[in-house]
Amino acid sequence: RTDLWVKGARRLSPAEVAHRWDQQQVQLLQARDQVTLTLDTAQGKLQLLSQYYEPVLDLLADLRPHAVAELRDALRDRVMPNDLHEVLAVLHGRQQLALVQNQAQQEAVSARCQAFNQYMRTRAMTNGDIACLLSPATGGCFTVGRLPQVFMEGWRKEALRDAEQLADYAWNILQPQGQRMMRDGQVLEAEADNLQELRKLAEAFLNELPRYQALQLV
């Protein structure tokens, strides 16, 4: 019965596709200078076209939500809509761009997401079995390991801003619990070695901090 069952996909018309693209909001998740235009593929490295990517990235560099329609209008004389959509799709596939909810949707879920995230960060002080934080921006869950969650607490509650301070903060939590870092499959026993490894991880956390902030995980 064709009134109940339809064979194959019911595809959107080009006008519907364009309309839905225009309504979508997007947000860059990495600092502008950290986004490279080299793409690793099965066939080797591919250089992305700077004449398309650079103007889009410049508009997204503030790490704030932007409607695709806004980007399209701003780039009307430089980037065609189909090329803009391709740029956004590639950045999203590289996890450098998020599809975000509108402001009303974010406000509706923000308090619950933040309460959940605070519970998880507090739990991370003694237990690292759940590596998940919720983003009010996207409405989704993002994998965040135990140590980044611990660093988040040091950054938020203690205003620790450099890798050495964050490493000391994490070590003061891990050491009394008898927990040690590992390097090359070996458990590190010396305090200096543990702190050295924690500093490396803290530096990686600070590099990721703009992403966490854009997703409202911190």
Please annotate each region the language model reported.
Residues 1-61, 65-218:
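Rossmann-like AdoMet/SAM-dependent catalytic core
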